[in-house]
From Swiss-Prot:
It comes from Haemophilus influenzae (strain PittGG). Keywords: Cytoplasm, Endonuclease, Hydrolase, Metal-binding, Nuclease, Ribosome biogenesis, rRNA processing, Zinc. GO terms for biological process: rRNA processing. The keyword Hydrolase applies. Gene3D superfamilies: Metalloproteases ('zincins'), catalytic domain. PROSITE patterns: UPF0054. InterPro entries: MetalPrtase_cat_dom_sf_prd, YbeY, YbeY_CS. It is found in: Cytoplasm. Its EC number is 3.1.-.-. Zn(2+) binds at H114, H118, H124. This is Endoribonuclease YbeY.
Length: 154
């Protein structure tokens, strides 16, 4: 199995309590499970203002969100090992973890896994897509040593 090369960008004032680059690489590799060569992606950890602006610009949602995924798109004849970019909002992840009574690092891992699956083309708009994606997220999270992230909802 290959690995995921992560360009980690920290764009938040408070860096205390953030996951390490090694953790993010481990979680992304667990989600992507690249075969052969490395694949590359960017993970940008931001504050609410940047998340809000990006969510409004690209999704028409007037609020910050936990994770945004921007898959890399290139012509079919061009083969580059680029997955795309994840933008994760520190404050939203921390708030959700507290509200859902989940360990903070487990929720960070879930957001990386969830975002990576979006980069791979998975979605959760339709119920059947959501079930497939949630099932895959659960398998990946358990493979990484975490509990089912949807346990409280079941």
């Amino acid at each position: 199995m290959g690995s995921v090369l992560v360009d980690l960008q920290i764009a938040t004032e408070n860096i205390e309590g953030l996951p390490t680059e090694e953790q993010i690489v481990q979680w992304a590799t667990g989600a992507v499970q690249p075969e052969g060569n490395e694949v590359e992606m960017t993970v940008r950890i931001v504050d609410e203002a940047e998340s809000h602006e990006l969510n409004l610009t690209y999704r028409g949602k007037d609020r910050p969100t936990n994770v945004l995924s921007f898959p890399f798109e290139c012509p079919d004849e061009v083969e580059l090992p680029l997955l795309g970019d994840l933008v994760i909002c520190r404050q939203v992840v921390e708030r959700e973890a507290a509200e859902q009574e989940k360990p903070l690092m487990a929720h960070w891992a879930h957001m990386v896994v969830h975002g990576c699956l979006h980069l791979l083309g998975y979605d959760h708009i339709e119920d059947d897509e959501a079930e497939e994606m949630e099932s895959l997220e659960t398998q990946i999270m358990q493979g990484l040593g975490f509990d089912d992230p949807y346990l409280a909802e079941k």
